[in-house]
Amino acid sequence: MWRLYRKTPKQLRNSVESCFKSVNSRQFSVSSFSAVAKDDKSVLKQQEVLHLLAKDQRFEERFFNQVQQTIRYFASKPNDLKKFFRKEASTDNKESSSSSDKKDSKGNKGEDNNPFNQFPGGWQQIAVSVGILLALYAFMDYQSYREISWKEFYSDFLEAGLVERLEVVDKRWVRIVSSSGKYAGQTCYFNIGSVDSFERSLGAAQHHLQYDADRQIPVLYKSEFNFKREIPNLISVAFPLLFGYYIYRMLKGGGAAGGAGRAGGGGLGGMFGGFGQSTARVINREDIKVKFADVAGCEEAKIEIMEFVNFLKNPQQYKDLGAKIPKGAILTGPPGTGKTLLAKATAGEANVPFITVSGSEFLEMFVGVGPARVRDMFSMARKNSPCILFIDEIDAVGRKRGGKGGMGGHSEQENTLNQLLVEMDGFTTDESSVIVIAATNRVDILDSALLRPGRFDRQIYVPVPDIKGRASIFRVHLGPLRTSLDKTVLSRKLAAHTPGFSGADISNVCNEAALIAARDANHEISNKHFEQAIERVVAGMEKKTQVLQKEEKKTVAYHEAGHAIAGWFLQHADPLLKVSIIPRGKGLGYAQYLPKEQYLYSKDQLLDRMCMTLGGRVAEEIFFGRITTGAQDDLQKVTQMAYSQVVKFGMSEKVGPLSFETPAPGEMAFDKPYSEATAQLIDQEVRDLVMNALRRTRDLLLEKRSDIERVALRLLEKEILNREDMIELVGKRPFVEKNTYEEMVSGTGGLDENVELPKGLENWNKESEKKKKDEEKKKNDE
């Protein structure tokens, strides 16, 4: 407090300290204050001020009244206050000030009637002055008061007979008015719980000290405004009001949220990171290194996206036929199939502005931010039209309305979705060339109004690549890798060994192969590194240091041998590539199969898959007479396959040709779409189906018991067996197999993916000749 006090202007300190002296000496008046204001030498030391204040017990009342008189004096004589804020008060200034005072007293009609506008700083200087006075008042009030306990009051005042009267202030504390004693020069007080308890305690104390009626201590009850005690209450009321006013000024200064694009950057947006402004970014074409040549495995989807770019580059080609440019397209498909990569390639190839934003960026903690950002985003897009607007993960904002989950954030999400619908195709939507492209892997949860033609005219499905698509993707990712292998042959081989892999998985395999080669200090990548990379992606990291007991290792060997033999002698099971008892990931063993490219499955094919999956558990039971927990994952897979046959595919005779919708993994099922009786029937059918597969597997493995034992012993010896080892141990599979890339793609129209463009898109990346001529003519005219 005194640090703030010492930083005040010298004249103001002089006047305040002289004011303190005048109050305590009972000689203060407005005229004396005016005289003191002109005296630069009347400065008291801090200790003297405290000493003078401590002598006067009624300082609080008189000083607070004097603050009010001081403010009134400042208002009537602003020129006196002007001296307080000057570094040096010269004689000329004093004379001019006195002359101006005379003019003011006589009344000068030519000056402003508002006294606060007649000196520099105006209200700000008065506020600072009053604040310093009130702060000093609270500080001095704190210095002159001393809190004591009831015991001290009893011993130092009541027993000594020094109490003149007691003042109960606001029914909360008691001020002691005494003539002299131990605490001379200070006002002592103590807090009370309630007035009733205080009166009982005081009466008992006076009775104990045998105070007669003449000596009874008078008690006064009064209410006072104590600035120091009311500061917390004032702050609790003033702070929310000031904060609300500050927010209002920020909003007013920043303009209507989203209404003016990015013009209102100085308002609340600066404090809350954009607030109503869109976080969409305009991508510079030179910053994007991805081109359409880098996108493979989804040629149909790529052609669709190329056509959108061609709409903007050569619109006349379509307008001549009366066609309208589509409003937008939504890319759907499983994760990792290249939806965002297609958008990046579009940004790298298009000669029009490309604006990108994430769906989650629309929703913030403030209500109304989402719709405001949608408006601002489309305002930006229209200013840059023709352009492409890409919204990634649109399911964050485009969920179906009226769903079950929600509360307050759900309503905000719906408002944002409504604004998005209006901006894409609403009453005020113009015909500007803004194409919206969105991406999501949860198209099933999107609102139907968002997917209708007129908003997203096309739904482009980007599937997991087939064997030809995988070969094309491998060629792209093998390009920068250092290897002496033929990359075309290698890409086809790897494509055959990675069924079901997405583009992201293939990219990860190539990168892992390079990392493994670098770890082994090799100068190039070989076949071995790619095989290890595939195993790492499929089954996890190899754990050679994990210690297995001899009995556990033997159990794992027979378990994996059971899988291998069951799959080897079942016609519709997948061909075996490799089996290992080296722990990987969460499993203690690992078997790699080669599934064929197949989209339709019969009941017999699904049954063979179930039998192959149960082979490990049955082998443990046959050779050890017991079962272990190692088959838990196998049982989960078998149960899922059985339920799918009964509930989804209608392959149960008792349940009939019915298909019920089941919740997706991770979703909660609040109710079942069938009755309890049907549920019991389904459970019984699933149990019968699994038990039938178990009996069939047991019969097969009992017949091939010697083959299982040979494979298990070789696994304990070598730990890893490949297809050639299996042929050596048990002979060739008794079924026709397709193991090479050429065998798998035979009869599909060629070895490689068809990348031929439609005739209308052959020049998609070239400006139309007419447009070029118009631009050249315009330049010549200029």
Swiss-Prot record:
Any GO BP annotation: positive regulation of gene expression
Residue spans, topological domain Mitochondrial intermembrane: 140-230
Membrane topology term: Multi-pass membrane protein
Binding site for ATP: G333, P334, P335, G336, T337, G338, K339, T340
One Gene Ontology cellular component: m-AAA complex
Keyword Cytoplasm: no
Disruption phenotype: RNAi-mediated knockdown disrupts tail tip morphogenesis resulting in retention of the pointed larval tail tip in adult males (also known as the Lep phenotype). RNAi-mediated knockdown induces nuclear and mitochondrial transcription of mitochondrial protective genes including chaperone hsp-60 as part of the mitochondrial unfolded protein response. RNAi-mediated knockdown causes nuclear accumulation of transcription factor atfs-1 in intestinal cells. RNAi-mediated knockdown results in mitochondria in intestinal cells which are abnormally elongated.
An annotated Gene Ontology molecular function: zinc ion binding
EC class name: hydrolase
Gene3D superfamilies: 1.10.8.60, 3.40.1690.20, P-loop containing nucleotide triphosphate hydrolases (3.40.50.300), Peptidase M41 (1.20.58.760)
More about this protein: Despite its gene name, this protein is an ortholog of human AFG3L2 and yeast AFG3 and not of human SPG7 and yeast YTA12 (C.elegans ortholog is actually ppgn-1).
Identification of the protein by name: AFG3-like protein spg-7
Organism in which the protein naturally occurs: Caenorhabditis elegans
